[in-house]
Amino acid sequence: MSMTPREIVHELNRHIIGQDDAKRAVAIALRNRWRRMQLPEELRVEVTPKNILMIGPTGVGKTEIARRLAKLANAPFIKVEATKFTEVGYVGRDVESIIRDLADAAIKLLREQEIVKVRHRAEDAAEDRILDALLPPARVGFNEDPAQSNDSNTRQLFRKRLREGQLDDKEIEIEINEAVGVDISAPPGMEEMTNQLQSLFANMGKGKTKSRKLKVKEALKLVREEEAGRLVNDEELKVKALEAVEQHGIVFIDEIDKVAKRGNSGGVDVSREGVQRDLLPLIEGCTVNTKLGMVKTDHILFIASGAFHLSKPSDLVPELQGRLPIRVELKALSPQDFERILTEPHASLTEQYRELLKTEGLKIEFKPDGIKRLAEIAWQVNEKTENIGARRLHTLLERLLEEVSFSAGDLAISPDAAPIEIDADYVNSHLGDLAENEDLSRYIL
């Protein structure tokens, strides 16, 4: 990650409106990963990541920041919900499975990167195998150079036709590695054992091939994947993945507020305080056994987030609060924010609906006054009923364009027809009554 904090924030601004404090905190944390790697070895070991706690109502961008961060980081990243885990000893997943999933994510990420590096060699090898199936190699004569014989004019002609896609529909018989897939169902919390059994059965069937009749296009894809897999060194990959997890891994824990003990409620709750206590060693730094070997979590960055509607950050156990030193508060959305969300982000909601209906030959145009009125209604409904943030816009837009979407094929008469204008009057006629009637909006919007 060589992007500066300013560049990271600029990239996040393309998709997320507002919440500058959260973006800055995340950008600095991400950049500090790179800064740490530039330090001398003895100092690098001492620098631990400053974990982040994002606090804010639902639908304001907490999860979206995590999603976009995953794409920017180019590092092992996993997003989990705190509610899915239970205390060790109870039925369900324990928190150590987070690190095992992170290890899987690292292997997948690095394998994809390695396959990109060997792509050209894999394509050449795949082409040769397809050509061998199309044109069995000629028998080498006395005093004849084998390379010359194999690279005959006919073979070169077929190679050219193969690359141009002229042979895509031709059927060939080719030897393909036989995949030994075994579906194993196991109760929650036993995923590790399931994975080990699946790996065992997969290794037992390794190297077995099966003759299949396929079209050239399908065969080329399968053979290319096979050849790329052969060129990737699995042992090297595991070593690199282990380092990537330990030094660059990022874990995003959503819904952390749901495992906070609310107020002074008594009684034992397996899914709450126990989960928090299990998270402590993970965030502080411990060793977890994974398929890559023993993974140290000392330098993994943890970002936790929660709405904290029914509980407060102070309801988390004190030790966990101390391990999330950076606090960022995300603000509730204003009507102006809703207006910007509808138009500014890359692939905004209005653009998505416009392009979806264009596939039917129907043009729609969102007018500025229509967008403004839609934003006002979204804010009003959120204030009167439950505040679900930007997710309210999805509900409103579906309701607003329901009739147009249903009749799109009939309405698209000619390419030159004037677009349907979504202005303030159109919005009021379709949503005005629902927005004004609190009882109706509570159930429908």
From Swiss-Prot:
Coiled coil: none
Pfam families recorded: AAA, AAA_2
Keyword Cytoplasm: yes
Record's GO cellular component terms: HslUV protease complex
Quaternary data: A double ring-shaped homohexamer of HslV is capped on each side by a ring-shaped HslU homohexamer. The assembly of the HslU/HslV complex is dependent on binding of ATP.
Chain's role: ATPase subunit of a proteasome-like degradation complex; this subunit has chaperone activity. The binding of ATP and its subsequent hydrolysis by HslU are essential for unfolding of protein substrates subsequently hydrolyzed by HslV. HslU recognizes the N-terminal part of its protein substrates and unfolds these before they are guided to HslV for hydrolysis.
Protein name, entry field: ATP-dependent protease ATPase subunit HslU
Gene name of the record: hslU
